[in-house]
């Protein structure tokens, strides 16, 4: 049994306090770092994230980092924010470490094991080891009662009468018999809906009581200014967020992104497929150059690009300078007052031919 953690402190990002729903609101940490309200933030630990491709308004994010006394980064790659760090702890890759059990309860429940194929190379360490050692040095050893990753995993597996050896004998995956989602609710007579009425609520009294509109109302977005397009972004089946663009095999499959432009709009601008342009948003932020993909598969008032490209980190030798970064062009965002979520498709760009 772990000891209770600290309680009572107001969350600086407003999650579950300023915002009625939402586990975290990362972009809302930026202003408290700068203003010191509701309390000063002096240090930041960045684990497995490319900060400059994650949080909107990059200039504001950099201003926040300049206010901090200490930045610790833990990663497997020399990401764009790494040069801003005071200390960098290189983590072992997924092939060199244990990770937590992957447990899914869906139609076919299963438990899967990820264990190292080789020992960690160079001076890298697994993330669990870093957390435990840092906790021990801070006098928090009671929160880390396990000496090894195997000990922790065996403790978890013991709740269902398994251990690592048994799991390995089954190929690293335990598949259990599933059951219909509603079976447990039907057996007890309970409702599957976690609402005050235990029914589907189209009208929310909880939202009304908190001062929000109890029924969703459509709020139109601003239209693009003359000469601009709404910036849309999305994912690629080849890459994972902004983390895999430097991976040799994946880089070979998709070395850079392209900007989708409606073919009629491209014709009007005198642009041809494959021609390279810079993107400049409504606040003057730029990214590129990026190749044009003229296509009928997008609205005439929008452009689209795959997220995760346009890296500035020299250590990312393959990805460095390839394509454009949608994150650099997201200097504005719309804040959802209920969840704290950030709507990022409220930025507009114009296309400037590369000279």
Task: Please state what every model-predicted region is.
Residues 107-110, 216, 221-226, 291-294, ...:
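Short flexible/disordered coil segments
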Residues 95-120, 130, 135-137:
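Glycine/threonine-rich phosphate-binding loop and adjacent beta-strand/alpha-helix elements that clamp
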Residues 86:
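Catalytic, metal-anchored helix/loop core of enzyme active sites in primary metabolism
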Residues 1-83, 93-103, 109, 173-269, ...:
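Extended redox/cofactor-interaction regions of prokaryotic respiratory oxidoreductases
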Residues 117, 121, 125-172, 244-260, ...:
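Long, contiguous, secondary-structure-rich segments that constitute the structural scaffold
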Residues 89-90:
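Catalytic alpha/beta core of large soluble enzyme barrels
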């Amino acid at each position: 049994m772990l000891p209770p953690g600290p309680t009572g402190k107001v969350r600086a990002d407003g999650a579950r306090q300023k915002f009625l729903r939402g586990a975290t609101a990362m972009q809302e940490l930026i202003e408290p770092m700068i203003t010191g309200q509701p309390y000063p933030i002096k240090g930041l630990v960045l684990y497995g994230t490319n900060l400059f491709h994650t949080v909107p308004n990059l200039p504001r994010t950099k201003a926040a980092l300049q206010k901090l006394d200490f930045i610790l980064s833990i990663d497997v790659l020399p990401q764009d924010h790494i040069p801003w760090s005071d200390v960098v702890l290189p983590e072992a890759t997924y092939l060199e470490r244990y990770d937590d059990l992957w447990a899914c309860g869906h139609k076919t429940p299963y438990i899967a094991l990820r264990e190292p194929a080789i020992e960690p190379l160079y001076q890298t360490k697994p993330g669990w080891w870093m957390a435990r050692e840092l906790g021990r040095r801070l006098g928090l050893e009671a929160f880390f009662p396990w000496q090894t990753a195997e000990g922790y995993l065996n403790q978890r597996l013991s709740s269902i009468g398994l251990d690592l050896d048994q799991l390995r004998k089954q190929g690293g995956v335990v598949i259990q018999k599933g059951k219909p989602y509603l079976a447990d609710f039907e057996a007890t007579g309970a409702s599957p809906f976690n609402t005050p009425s235990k029914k589907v609520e189209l009208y929310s009294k909880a939202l009304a009581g908190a001062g929000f509109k109890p029924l969703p109302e459509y709020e139109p977005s601003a239209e693009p200014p003359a000469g601009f397009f709404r910036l849309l972004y999305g994912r690629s089946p080849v890459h994972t967020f902004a983390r895999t663009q430097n991976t040799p095999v994946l880089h070979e499959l998709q070395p850079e992104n392209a900007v989708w432009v409606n073919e009629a709009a491209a014709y009007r601008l005198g642009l041809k497929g494959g021609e390279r342009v810079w993107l400049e948003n409504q606040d003057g932020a730029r990214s590129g150059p990026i190749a044009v993909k003229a296509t009928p598969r997008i609205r005439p008032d929008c452009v689209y690009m795959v997220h995760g490209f346009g890296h500035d980190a020299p250590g990312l030798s393959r990805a460095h300078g390839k394509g454009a970064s949608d994150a650099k062009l997201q200097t504005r965002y719309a804040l959802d007052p209920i969840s704290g979520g950030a709507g990022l498709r409220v930025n507009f760009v114009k296309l400037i031919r590369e000279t």
